[in-house]
Amino acid sequence: MEAAASVFDERGYEAATIADILTRAGVTKGALYFHFSSKQDLARGVLDEQFAEGGVPPRQSKLQELVDTSMVMAHRMQRDPMLSAGARLSLGPDMREIFGGGSVPGWIKVTEEMLIQAKARGELLPHVNTAETAWTLSACWTGVQIYSQTLVNREDIEHRVSVLFEHVYPSIATPAVLARLEMGRTRGAEVVAEMRRLEAAEVVGDQVAS
């Protein structure tokens, strides 16, 4: 799957071939087709992986959790071909017809669910429409990553996503909540480090229990 993601990320869906993927993966055609029936099936697997990664640690503030999710994605986008390929597959020509919009509908849904929870907790200003805000925020995030990729090969994506939230959140978050939110450009790296510490502690706990 990682080999397929790398090829899709570098060449796009149409230009990528099964031969390219086989060469990159170092496996036989039979081994590949045992798991995936076609190039389209492989691409769907890459798209499904967008939501397979464990989520960020739960936060008292759902708006913080949404920032953390987005900043972790920005951090990993530069380092994980699976995420980068998923973005390219979702936004390429004719991808709506082939994949139904790729991961875009899923991310809009994830964003809206967090905003609904934030509203229930009193974190949002009264005028905020969660569905419209989720669509707009997701579209803005996508635009930021496309511009960052086009202009500087995503070298500034974490800074740009941070700036996005600094511009959007004052119009939707209550002042008390806004004052407590952490939205700096290093937030993604900090949360990833936190997740690794939690995973390591869980492994140690399992070993002790066994």
Q: Each PLM stretch: what is its role?
A:
Residues 46, 50, 54, 141-148, ...:
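Hydrophobic recognition helices of helix-based DNA-binding modules
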Residues 45, 53-83, 134:
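Hydrophobic alpha-helical connector segments
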Residues 85-90, 137, 141, 168:
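Short alpha-helical scaffolding segments that buttress acidic/His motifs in well-ordered protein cores
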Residues 73-127:
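Short secondary-structure transition hinges
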Residues 3, 7-41, 45, 49:
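Helix-turn-helix
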Residues 3-10, 53, 136, 140-147:
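Solvent-exposed, amphipathic alpha-helical segments
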